[in-house]
């Protein structure tokens, strides 16, 4: 049992490393990619328009995406809240917001195989708390923030 758990943790860490490396290959730091995917102060955003930007980077239709209607600085502030276990049940760098924010969840309505330039989405808007995973900033990030959000772990 012990070796299997260790192997699965190593695989998860390798997968996380690959995701972070992919974000870097796209010319973005993990925190910059987090901001592109999840931070948008326009509470009336149009999912079809905003998701085009994300899908252009990915070159595929993303099935679901959550936008937080808050500032990046406010999301960074959440990194100062007590840390806890992330949804992967392994990482312990997740932090819950202390107040609810407006969110928009964009859910794909077109087929996933649709060309990424033609994806269509349905919005769902609500007011929720959120959880972010935070890491020390990279050298390419602003020195203003020593710790930055790199992953939206969920909303509640």
Swiss-Prot record:
Coiled-coil annotated residue ranges, if any: none
Disulphide linkage map: 47-106, 61-119, 79-134, 86-94
Pfam family, one: RnaseA
Active-site residues, as the UniProt record annotates them: 38, 151
Catalytic activity, EC: 3.1.27.-
Principal subcellular localisation of the protein: cytoplasm
Family statement: Belongs to the pancreatic ribonuclease family.
Protein name in UniProt: Eosinophil cationic protein 2
Record organism: Mus musculus (Mouse)
